[in-house]
């Protein structure tokens, strides 16, 4: 019997990340540094370890709404070009250190205007941080490609403006659009104008759906909004039955929505640890990730918010390995799923799969 993969082994594997929030992945030390530099005095702790613990425990709240509350502190220290550049640069460094070779990072420009920056200045600062981080990592022998998704908050009314922002920057590092925030009372159909604008410009978008809210959210995101991917989408399990008895015991039966999702190969940006924190699932072992993977949905592994969940890609993969016994071939499949689903051109996706991911996994598999 093959020994289970250890965390340090998984660290060596190339990874592709599709769902990670810039304002949810700051280093605790950076939060403290920028707070001191900018005069923000609202932090709940002044010690690095205490602050990290506060973010983790406060985010383990059991609901999406309470999970989102700690973001007020990270957003508060991301209100200058210098702060945004630093956070973006360090994001690239941290991902590359974890052997991530491709990442799409998202954030909501509308949350960073408190000190007078325009949306374009905000995006420019983040992309400059990404570019400088990529150069530094390449020079250090850890090449990585990082692209940006601009997010509109679903409770606000600027989604069309953010969609226009995505198109203005589409050839400079922005590869798509997203809506995020509390799902309850904020259906994706409120933002049809933004999604129509993206389609009119042949652009890609993902939608947070099926995280805290159920099947109606997923149905609207796919049927009415035309999402290319689903942020989370974990509640699609509500449309899947595993027969408990009879001659077909154990057989999986999909409802119509689940069938459409699988048939159209719509990627699921699954974030296991985050889903436990928000109460979407009780534990990693209870997460429907394995059911969805075995049923051949296009599942991907993601971090969501590295600071709030005290996580990183290797840890997310290791937790899935511990829960479901996955081996190298499984992790390779999930990684290729993510790379196939990226919002960069086909030839660029294929090059990373064929020239980076497959060769490095071939060495690991042996």
From Swiss-Prot:
Top EC group: hydrolase
Cofactor(s) in the UniProt record: Zn(2+)
One annotated GO molecular function: adenosine deaminase activity
Annotated residues for binding of substrate: 21, 23, 181
Keywords: Hydrolase, Metal-binding, Nucleotide metabolism, Zinc
GO terms under cellular component: cytosol
Site residues, Important for catalytic activity: 232
Catalytic residue list: 211 (proton donor)
Pfam family, one: A_deaminase
Catalytic activities: adenosine + H2O + H(+) = inosine + NH4(+); 2'-deoxyadenosine + H2O + H(+) = 2'-deoxyinosine + NH4(+)
Amino acids binding Zn(2+): 19, 21, 208, 304
Cofactor comment text: Binds 1 zinc ion per subunit.
Domain of life: Bacteria
Gene Ontology biological process: adenosine catabolic process; hypoxanthine salvage; inosine biosynthetic process; nucleotide metabolic process; purine ribonucleoside monophosphate biosynthetic process
InterPro entries reported for this sequence: A_deaminase, A_deaminase_dom, Ado/ade_deaminase, Metal_Hydrolase
Entry EC number(s): 3.5.4.4
Cleavable signal peptide: none
Protein function: Catalyzes the hydrolytic deamination of adenosine and 2-deoxyadenosine.
Family note: Belongs to the metallo-dependent hydrolases superfamily. Adenosine and AMP deaminases family. Adenosine deaminase subfamily.
The protein's name in its UniProt record: Adenosine deaminase
Chain's gene name: add
């Amino acid at each position: 019997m093959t020994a289970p993969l250890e965390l340090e082994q998984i660290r060596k594997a190339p990874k592709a990340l599709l769902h990670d929030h810039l304002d949810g992945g700051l280093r605790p030390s950076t939060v403290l540094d920028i707070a001191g530099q900018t005069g923000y005095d609202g932090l709940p702790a002044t010690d690095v370890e205490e602050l990290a613990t506060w973010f983790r425990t406060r985010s383990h709240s059991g609901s999406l709404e309470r999970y989102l509350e700690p973001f007020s502190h990270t957003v508060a220290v991301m209100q200058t070009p210098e702060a945004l550049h630093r956070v973006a640069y360090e994001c690239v460094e941290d991902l590359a250190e974890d052997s991530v070779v491709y990442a799409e990072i998202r954030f909501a420009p509308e949350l960073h205007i408190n000190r007078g920056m325009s949306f374009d200045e905000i995006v420019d600062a983040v992309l400059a941080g990404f570019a400088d981080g990529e150069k530094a990592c390449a020079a250090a022998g850890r090449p990585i490609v990082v692209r940006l998704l601009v997010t509109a908050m679903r409770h606000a009314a600027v989604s069309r403006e953010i969609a226009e922002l995505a198109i203005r920057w589409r050839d400079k590092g922005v590869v798509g659009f997203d809506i995020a925030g509390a799902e309850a009372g904020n259906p994706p159909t409120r933002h049809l104008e933004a999604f129509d604008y993206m389609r009119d410009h042949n652009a890609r978008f993902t939608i947070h759906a099926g995280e805290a809210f159920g099947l109606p959210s997923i149905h609207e995101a796919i049927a009415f909004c035309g999402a290319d991917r689903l942020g989370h989408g974990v509640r699609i399990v509500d449309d899947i039955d595993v027969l408990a008895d009879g001659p077909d015991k154990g057989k999986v039966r999909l409802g119509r929505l689940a069938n459409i999702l699988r048939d159209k190969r719509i990627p699921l940006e699954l974030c296991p640890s985050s889903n436990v924190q928000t109460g979407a699932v009780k534990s990693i072992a209870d997460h429907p990730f394995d059911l969805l993977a075995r049923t051949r949905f296009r599942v991907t592994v993601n971090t969501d918010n590295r600071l709030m969940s005290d996580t990183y890609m290797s840890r997310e993969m290791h937790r899935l390995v511990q829960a479901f016994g996955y081996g190298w071939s499984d992790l390779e499949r999930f990684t290729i799923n993510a790379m196939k689903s990226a919002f960069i051109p086909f030839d660029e996706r294929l090059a990373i799969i064929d020239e980076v991911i497959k060769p490095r996994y071939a060495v690991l598999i042996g």
